Design a protein with these regions (language model features):
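Catalytic beta-strand/loop module used to bind and position nucleotide/cofactor moieties
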Residues: 1-3, 8-11, 18-140
Length: 140
C-alpha cells in the first residue's frame, strides 16, 4: 500500500520506515523524498561513497560502477491523513537473486546492486550512525 512498484526486503538490507507527520511539519511529499535522498547522500559522502540521483520518476539513489549507475537505495512511501508511512531501503549485502523474480520498482534487475556486489568498502555501523545523525539534523 505504498507508492512505487514491487520491491523486496531481506537480510543484508537496511530498511528505515519512519512515521512523519508532514502536515504538522508543513512539508509535501516531494520535499520529504528530497530530504531522504539528501540524508543518504550526505551520510554516504562521509564514508567516501558517492551517490547519484537520476532525473526520472523512479526515485532513489545509485552508485557508479564501470560507467554504469546501479541502484542501491529505494524509496517507497504511503501518504495518509498527513502522515508518511514506509520509507527507504539500502542494499548492503543482500542476496540479489531475489530481485530476479520480480520487476523491482519497475526496473530491470540488472540495474539493481548492493555495496558488497560492487566491491565498495564500507563500515556498516559507521554508515548507520551517519544516517542517524543526518536524519536527526533534518527531522529533530
Amino acid at each position: 500500500n505504498r507508492g512505487g512498484k514491487i520491491t523486496f526486503h531481506g537480510p543484508g538490507q537496511l530498511v528505515i520506515y519512519p512515521l512523519i507527520n508532514l502536515k504538522k511539519r508543513k512539508k509535501n511529499i516531494i520535499d520529504y523524498i528530497n530530504s531522504l535522498e539528501e540524508i543518504c547522500i550526505k551520510a554516504f559522502k562521509r564514508n567516501d561513497i558517492k551517490l547519484f540521483r537520476k532525473k526520472e520518476k523512479n526515485r532513489g539513489l545509485w552508485v557508479e560502477n564501470n560507467n554504469e549507475l546501479k541502484k542501491i537505495i529505494f524509496i517507497g512511501l504511503r501518504y495518509s491523513k498527513g502522515i508518511i508511512h514506509h520509507g527507504l531501503s539500502i542494499n548492503f549485502d543482500l542476496d540479489l537473486d531475489n530481485f530476479q523474480k520480480i520487476d523491482p520498482c519497475g526496473l530491470n534487475s540488472k540495474d539493481i546492486s548492493s555495496l558488497k556486489e560492487l566491491k565498495i568498502n564500507y563500515n556498516k555501523r559507521k554508515i548507520y550512525q551517519d544516517l542517524k545523525e543526518e536524519f536527526m539534523k533534518v527531522f529533530y
